[in-house]
């Protein structure tokens, strides 16, 4: 994801990575899962809202697009595989294992930036605690109760929230189409929660 952002822009990188719900849908269909048509519609309408919100016109690197799509596919596989492990071992354990091995694998590539981390220790602690610690633990805990396809739709709200908060903090102006995209993603997120709630009620009755 970060390589995709480096070669293009933050908006393009985030938009490509958050196409992963579509890949979750494709993988689940190949696995023979029975996915309702409404769920398919929610995923694609949600991505359309994300498309309106993010600026894809700034794509400048085809390789960056490839990196973004590879990241999306790997994230889809991680969520599908990790959902069962989260139920089995708990969200906190799954988050710890994920971060532990990620740190080992990335350490050779980030050795030169170690001095920056020490010089900006409080910033590093903040990012590590909130973005990685709280974020991943909460995510893997929630996925115990919500199917991977549904969690993908709801997480469309993450880049949307980032754009809106960024606009508020940095005083960036948003286009009308971006507000429309924000409204679509927000409504899709609410619809997904209602859809999952009804399914859980029907399952408990049966």
Description of each model-found segment:
Residues 1, 41-45, 63-72, 116-134, ...:
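Loop-to-transmembrane-helix transition segments
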Residues 1-3, 20-41, 160-180:
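C-terminal transmembrane-helix exit sites in multi-pass transporters
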Residues 3-6, 51-63, 107-125, 167-177:
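Membrane-interface helix termini and inter-helical loops of multi-pass transporters
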Residues 13-19, 81-101, 132-168:
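Helix-helix packing/entry segments at the starts of transmembrane helices
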Residues 21-26, 73-76, 107, 128-133, ...:
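Hydrophobic/small/kink-forming positions within alpha-helical transmembrane segments
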Residues 24-26, 53, 57-113, 206:
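Transmembrane alpha-helical segments that form core, pore/gating elements
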Residues 35-55, 106, 165, 177-196:
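Hydrophobic transmembrane alpha-helices of multi-pass small-molecule transport proteins
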Residues 122, 156-206:
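C-terminal-most transmembrane helix of multi-pass membrane proteins
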């Amino acid at each position: 994801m970060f390589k995709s952002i480096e070669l293009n822009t933050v908006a393009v990188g985030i938009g490509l990575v958050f196409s992963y719900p579509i890949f979750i849908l494709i993988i689940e269909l190949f696995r023979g899962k029975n996915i309702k048509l409404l769920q398919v519609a929610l995923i694609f309408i949600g991505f359309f809202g994300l498309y309106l919100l993010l600026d894809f016109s700034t794509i400048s690197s085809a390789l960056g697009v490839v990196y973004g799509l590879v990241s999306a596919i790997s994230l889809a596989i991680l969520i599908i595989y990790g959902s069962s492990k989260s139920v089995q071992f708990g969200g906190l354990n799954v988050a710890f294992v994920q971060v532990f091995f990620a740190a080992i694998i990335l350490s050779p590539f980030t050795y030169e930036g170690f001095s920056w981390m020490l010089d900006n220790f409080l910033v590093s602690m903040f990012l590590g605690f909130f973005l990685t610690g709280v974020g991943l633990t909460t995510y893997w805990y929630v996925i115990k109760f919500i199917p991977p396809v549904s969690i993908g739709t709801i997480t469309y709200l993450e880049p949307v929230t980032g754009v809106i908060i960024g606009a508020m903090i940095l005083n960036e102006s948003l286009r009308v189409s971006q507000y429309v995209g924000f409204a679509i993603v927000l409504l899709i997120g609410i619809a997904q929660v209602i859809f999952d709630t009804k399914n859980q009620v029907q399952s408990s009755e049966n």
